[in-house]
Amino acid sequence: MARRDAAGVRLITRHGNDFTARFPLAVEAVTRLPANSFLLDGEAIVTNERGLAVFDLIRHKRHGADAVLLAFDLIELDGEDLRRSPIEHRKRKLVKLVRGPHPGIVLNEHYEGDGAIVFIACKLGCEGIVSKRLGSLYRSGRSQHWLKIKNPAAPAVNREAEEDWGR
């Protein structure tokens, strides 16, 4: 999560850890966005030469300075609580906030369709996608309207499976 308010910018993990100092490029980008205050949902990523996120790299401190913020939802904007707004409304506001060249922050692309994009993401080597039902409201945690679909061939997914099964 990235929060900007009168106190400044903070990057907070889903477990409440403050990673602001770890990702200076993302902090600088969030500082430059055209709003007084906001809370956006996103993830710090490091990309490879093809522009794909490589989640193993983010675990290494030496890559923290290279990390960018992948923004995928907007929760608050200039005092307006958007959690009860449908995903389409939040995405439109997020696009307006993040559009333009902002090194250090990228907008997660939004696709509408029947799921074919999952197969494309898998072929590209992506870890997976999150499918959000049109009209869904913002909820923290898991939801029946938001599904994380993992690519079983992705290295990060295989590593998670090995850790879960103790291999």
Please state what every model-predicted region is.
Residues 1-167:
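Catalytic cores of nucleic-acid ligases and guanylyltransferases
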